[in-house]
A protein has these predicted regions:
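Short, conserved active-site loop motifs that form the nucleotide-linked donor/cofactor pocket
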Residues: 166-167, 190, 258
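Conserved proline-anchored active-site loop of SAM-dependent methyltransferases
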Residues: 10-12, 23-37, 44-48, 119-126, ...
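Short amphipathic alpha-helix with an adjacent loop that forms part of the alpha/beta core around
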Residues: 178-187
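Short loop/edge segments at beta-strand edges and connector loops
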Residues: 170-172, 264
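Class I S-adenosyl-L-methionine-dependent methyltransferase module
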Residues: 40-168
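Long, positively charged, glycine-interspersed low-complexity recognition regions
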Residues: 199, 208-286
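Mobile active-site "lid"/loop adjacent to the S-adenosyl-L-methionine
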Residues: 134, 138-146, 198-218
Length: 286
């Protein structure tokens, strides 16, 4: 969420068209972008069913109930109420206690998983992200963050967005989503935003070859198809990551005369090694 929030402050939404009727967030992730877009209808999609469970959490639960549950678990397990970065937090013994509390909570969640505990775990996991092993167990290590007032604001915004806006939630691969949406009579009113996994980065969501060159190629084909329908779209991506250039993306931009928008002073940061100095851009067909 952090990267997109920073880009929103740097004018990401301002680069979108005015008067959007249907906003399609193809790789919604935290859905922070969609929450900041004014549209008549929001289509929120992600292929990760765990993220879709969070959208449904915001849609179906009261904000007070969510926050109360999180605070209850913090008290029950003795989770940290402040950041515990080792070079800033002086009490090393406390850090170990908080880590043990997290591991206990994680083990209990894996025994009896539920969406409220899953969401609570994320606030204390490394980089506040999630990951599951082959057994379906949450296995993200303990991080140094905690549940904060900023997190409470995000929950309030999320609940308001999913409960009060006209939203339609999908849990599809991007290829299947576009195939389905382009059959709708209102497809010409749609604006598509893509924030795919970035080829060549090592973010948690892209471990174990989660995003392949074939996926990248298929995505480019879908973008071309939308352009053929005269449908506007925008895509966030990274062209250069620590010296590794995404030549596939550059060739696609050049071949189709897409526009590339940059954000002064913004560097893409991901949970993973080797992602420093990766400049994020916005690519559009308008």
């Amino acid at each position: 969420m952090g990267n997109k929030k920073k880009l929103i402050h740097k004018g990401l939404i301002d680069k979108f068209p005015d008067n959007i009727s249907v906003f399609v967030d193809v790789f919604a992730g935290s859905s922070i972008v969609g929450m900041n877009v004014n549209a008549d209808i929001h289509i929120v999609n992600d292929s990760d069913s765990n993220l879709v469970k969070l959208y449904e959490l915001f849609e179906n639960y009261d904000v007070t109930d969510i926050i109360n549950h999180i605070n209850s678990r913090i008290g029950e397990y003795g989770l940290a109420r402040e950041r515990t970065k080792r070079n800033e937090f002086k009490d090393k013994r406390k850090i170990d206690e908080y880590k043990s509390a997290y591991m206990k909570f994680r083990a209990d969640y894996n025994t009896n998983p539920n969406v409220l505990d899953f969401y609570t775990l994320m606030f204390y996991s490394f980089s506040q992200q999630f990951r599951f092993n082959n057994k379906g167990e949450f296995n993200m290590p303990c991080g140094n963050d905690c549940f904060s007032h900023k997190n409470e604001e995000y929950i309030k915004n999320g609940c308001e967005f999913f409960s009060k806006c006209t939203t339609k939630i999908y849990n599809n691969d991007f290829r299947e989503l576009l195939k389905e949406l382009l059959k709708m009579k209102c497809h010409e009113k749609m604006f598509f935003y893509f924030d795919p996994p970035y080829l060549g980065t090592t973010a948690t969501y892209n471990e174990n070859n989660g995003w392949s060159e074939q996926d990248e190629t298929d995505l480019y084909s879908e973008l071309e198809k939308l352009s053929e329908y005269n449908i506007k779209w925008a895509m966030s991506n990274v062209i250069n990551n620590k010296g590794r250039v995404n030549q596939m993306l550059i060739d696609q931009i050049d071949a189709n005369n897409y526009n590339v928008h940059t954000f002064d002073g913004f560097t893409y940061m991901a949970c993973g090694k080797g992602n420093s100095n990766a400049k994020e851009v916005l690519i559009t067909n308008y």
